[in-house]
């Protein structure tokens, strides 16, 4: 396996080291290439992502990302627009995958959380995030700013198909989320895609939520969900809410996936670089380790993916609220997957 590693900034460096420790405990064929991308490089020479970086990254089977950014020194949005979004668009990461599971030992803010285990499939290359907009008469009383949500049949069809496939492999229930009563053009395209592709998956139950209703249900009845599919913006909102109801983002992994496998997909913990605790050895590496499990599953190694997920589940279940040490968690999980 040829793996590109972008450990990034802050605690990204620490949690990525533990994720690699666990990966190498289950696989002895991992060849890693480290990339200096993130706040440190930007502050050093002003670079975010060069064409040479991109071409080199494309030569790998997958990308493991730690965390990017330092809000103390890098202006907001610089690395998102200059590094993360270009990676997703230029590597055609059409599917942003976010499993959301309430692990034993994790504390949900919900009073009666019940069993929470669902996946959000977020469209990753279109919608309001594709940069189709502009400003006229900036700085005047007549200023006009626009952002255009771009939705294509090609883009929507492939993410909807991916979501149906995942639902078929899970509990056979798909919920699509939009705002069709107001966003009639984009919503209509999404609805036609759902209806068309749904005919190929007659065993999958389909329902629909407006985005505002989905935020309510995710807080009041999250166990109703199995697979959620939605657009880029709504998915961005829902996945953060999903992280909150499952006890925070310490156990939240994600994948930015090219479903065609023509480009390397990228896997990362949801959390940020947390510079306030960087270097203290107290960051929870479980989200980064679960990102490795997502990566292995994407690459067809289901057995080792399940092995890692079980080890993380056991790790979470065994916690008693005491402070954790980053390397100790990595050591325990690495030992567990080798047992």
Curated annotation (Swiss-Prot):
Designated name of the protein: 3-isopropylmalate dehydrogenase
GO cellular component: cytoplasm
UniProt family annotation: Belongs to the isocitrate and isopropylmalate dehydrogenases family. LeuB type 2 subfamily.
Function: Catalyzes the oxidation of 3-carboxy-2-hydroxy-4-methylpentanoate (3-isopropylmalate) to 3-carboxy-4-methyl-2-oxopentanoate. The product decarboxylates to 4-methyl-2 oxopentanoate.
Any GO MF annotation of the entry: magnesium ion binding
Sites where the protein binds NAD(+): 272-284
Swiss-Prot/TrEMBL catalytic activity: (2R,3S)-3-isopropylmalate + NAD(+) = 4-methyl-2-oxopentanoate + CO2 + NADH
Pathway entry: Amino-acid biosynthesis; L-leucine biosynthesis; L-leucine from 3-methyl-2-oxobutanoate: step 3/4
Higher taxonomy: Bacteria, Bacillati, Actinomycetota, Actinomycetes, Mycobacteriales
Organism expressing this protein natively: Corynebacterium urealyticum (strain ATCC 43042 / DSM 7109)
Gene name as annotated: leuB
